[in-house]
Design a protein with these regions (language model features):
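Bacterial N-terminal signal peptides
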Residues: 8-20
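N-terminal secretory signal peptides that target proteins for export/translocation
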Residues: 1-9
Length: 332
């Protein structure tokens, strides 16, 4: 009488074990694909980032800070990078003289140069904060934060610089995003009255909720909610997940086709929530990236400016590739 039951139990156990092994095999394959994609991208980030420095001889908000952030993420995840070059250019990027072409250095000073490079400064800070101790280059990083605070607008916002105001979204949304990134680079510090006041004013500016139009707005707002310990982080996470496209990715603009920029941003934001909470969404996004990468390690990304007319551009491709690497490294 007991034999059929025993056979049934054995069959169930074998079936369960088979399914488990299959799931582990699929997961291992997915992880391998992610690793291959990251490894392929590292030389692209190094080569094209150094080419930009050689040609322009300066840092920019989208190029050098994201070279450093992407390579820091890859290094932290255990991938090989040129550590000597990374350290050299990380140090070089912290000096205000590096934020402009050397031809203009004699006509500028720190204050005037910082005014047009707030975006550069907060991305330089964010690209280091996850991967090194607070003591590393503490004085220089403190100076960058002081300069960011000094360039806050009267209404509490931080003005987007360079080409950012020309992006394909309302200027108000771009300004809110710039203010969110600035706040993320200025974590709360009770013994810094100037920073505390700047944060208060910036948060007041952000009280006006906009209808999310870009993955960057949703991701940056989610990251800020997490920094604040705000209960709205759960709602923001649901908004981000609901915007995921059928192919697993996100567009930089939510009503557009998936690209590496929006997808990398979304992955990074989800990794800060808890990457164990949303494995399906993360897995789908990873598969979108691993299946759409170019042979040279990049991901072609449509330009974010109106003048790009939706066509891939060198700067947006580099920016998006760096975000893809960051997102993949943080969720692998």
């Amino acid at each position: 009488m007991c034999k059929p039951i025993g056979l049934a139990v054995g069959f169930v156990a074998i079936t369960w074990l088979t399914q488990l092994l299959f799931a582990l095999e699929v997961r291992a394959e997915a992880e391998t694909d992610v690793d291959v994609a990251i490894q392929r991208s590292v030389p692209f980030l190094e080569r094209e980032g150094l080419a930009w420095i050689g040609k322009r001889q300066c840092v920019s908000c989208h190029q050098v800070p994201f070279m450093l952030w992407g390579l820091n993420a890859a290094k932290n995840a255990g991938f090989g990078v040129d550590e000597a070059s990374l350290a050299k250019h990380a140090d070089w990027s912290l000096t205000w003289q590096s934020w402009q072409n050397p031809k203009n250095a004699s006509e500028s000073d720190e204050a005037s140069t910082a005014k047009g490079n707030v975006d550069t400064m907060y991305f330089l800070l964010l690209g280091r904060s996850d991967y090194e101790s607070n003591e590393t280059k503490a004085d220089q990083k403190a100076n960058l934060r002081r300069l960011i605070v000094a360039n806050q607008q009267a209404d509490g916002s931080f003005k987007p610089g360079g080409q950012l105001p020309k992006q394909r979204r309302p200027l108000e949304a771009t300004t809110q995003v710039a203010t969110m990134w600035a706040l993320l680079a200025l974590p709360p510090r009770e013994d810094d009255a100037d920073r505390s006041e700047a944060r208060r004013k910036a948060l007041e500016f952000l009280e006006k909720e906009l209808t999310p139009a870009s993955a960057e707005w949703v991701a940056a707002r989610l990251l800020l909610d997490l920094q604040l310990g705000d209960a709205k982080a759960a709602e923001r996470t649901r908004t981000l997940l609901a915007a995921q496209n059928e192919d697993g990715g996100w567009g930089w603009l939510l009503n557009e086709q998936s690209d590496a920029f929006g997808t990398g941003l979304a992955l990074y934001a989800l990794s800060q929530v808890d990457k164990q909470e949303h494995p399906d969404a993360i897995g789908r996004a990873q598969r979108f990236l691993t299946s759409s990468q170019a042979e040279d390690g990049s991901w072609p990304v449509p330009g974010t400016k109106q003048t790009a007319q939706g066509k891939p551009r060198e700067t947006s491709t580099y920016w998006g590739t760096a975000w893809a690497v960051i997102g993949l490294c943080e969720t692998r």
